[in-house]
Design a protein with these regions (language model features):
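Glycine-centered loop/turn motif at secondary-structure junctions
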Residues: 38-39, 100, 163, 191, ...
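Short secondary-structure transition/capping segments
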Residues: 55, 116-119, 209, 227-230, ...
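Active-site beta->alpha loop and helix N-cap motifs at the rims of alpha/beta catalytic domains
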Residues: 2-150
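Catalytic alpha/beta core domains of metabolic enzymes, predominantly
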Residues: 132-135, 144-255
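A structural signal for short hydrophobic/aromatic patches embedded in well-ordered alpha helices
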Residues: 63, 123, 159, 241, ...
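C-terminal alpha-helical cap/extension of soluble enzyme domains
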Residues: 4-14, 33-40, 212, 219-307
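A general structural signal for well-ordered alpha-helical segments in protein cores
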Residues: 27, 60, 64, 89, ...
Length: 307
């Protein structure tokens, strides 16, 4: 198996128990739902939306084996394995590979600000060398608003040139289409076997036209079916469907994204345990829940009227 299939991915939210530990079985069932009925071609657990940096190392190390035991599709799961500690990133990446999940999403080391390009290069080079597996497929994780550690385009090109297929692509969470296009243009995008994934489904058609591979988004936890409807439509129906995608994305952006996606899953599943957040994040307030519920009802009414 090589790289992950292209398409629409959800940056999956994570369910926590009362003690703050991740509930692996519940996460697996949820990811299965996303791919079977939730409109997703794949899932990216333990990323930002999944509160990955708030999950213990022991839980993160155990997840890939649990996914493998549940026979989750190896080419449709991209585990977040980043850590500021190079050794921890190596261990997490090895755990994914040992379970048959070759595709990983790697944040840059984000604690020390303004690292040099050489320092960032060294971080990824050491991970690749210490993991020592040609089957590894790394998706660089560009999220400058949160990590405060952007990937210069020239560095991405250098990593791809030096490590070939191991540097499989990049998730661009900048929210800036011009930035996503710059990464695709510099690497050749899908034609150059470098898969760029913007983080907003609102730009899905522009992204695909620019040579990107799909979308990895937090709001596709709830709205991926709308994206698939737009992709399968044509003519005026496509324009209408894309507008529905944009409205849904704008609705999600009105709220703390992780808390909102968890609240939506709690409503869908009838399981309020989904609203648990890892500190410092908190669940939606009662006022936010009421507003979100009203916004979702309005979205559903608009969708029904358009059918």
């Amino acid at each position: 198996m090589s790289k992950a299939v292209r398409g629409i991915y959800a940056a999956a939210v994570s369910p926590f128990g009362p003690d703050g530990g991740i509930l692996a079985d519940k996460l697996i069932a949820y990811c299965r739902y996303l791919m079977a009925d939730g409109g997703c071609d794949g899932v990216a657990p333990t990323g930002t939306t999944g509160e990955g940096n708030s999950i213990t190392m022991s839980d993160r190390l155990a997840l890939p084996a649990a996914f493998a035991a549940a026979d989750m599709p190896r080419d449709r799961v991209i585990f977040g394995t980043g850590s500021c500690a190079t050794g921890d990133a190596v261990a997490l990446t090895k755990a994914a590979l040992a379970a048959g999940f070759n595709n990983v999403l790697l944040l840059p080391p984000f604690y020390y600000k303004n690292p040099s390009d050489e320092g960032l290069y060294s971080y990824f080079a050491q991970i690749i060398e210490r993991v020592g597996d040609a089957n590894l497929r790394i998706y660089l994780y560009h999220f400058p608003q949160v990590s405060m550690t952007p990937f210069p385009v020239d560095l991405v090109v250098r990593l791809k040139k030096d490590f070939g297929a191991v540097i499989a692509g990049l998730k661009d969470s900048s929210g800036d289409f011009a930035q996503s296009k710059a990464f695709a243009d510099a690497t050749g995008g899908v034609k150059g076997d470098f898969d760029v994934y913007p983080s907003s489904e609102a730009m899905v058609f522009d992204a695909l036209e620019a040579g990107c591979a799909g979308i990895i988004s937090g709001s596709t936890n709830a709205f991926a079916n709308k994206v698939q409807a737009a992709l399968s439509a044509s003519g005026e129906a496509r324009a209408t469907a894309l507008e529905a995608v944009k409205v849904a994305r704008a609705t999600a952006a009105k709220y703390p994204l992780m808390s909102a996606m968890k609240q939506i899953e709690a409503w869908r599943s009838g399981d309020e345990a989904w609203t648990r957040m890892a500190p410092p994040l908190v669940p939606l307030s009662n006022a936010q829940k009421a507003a979100l519920r009203a916004d979702l009802d309005a979205l559903e009414a608009t969708s029904a009227a358009a059918e």
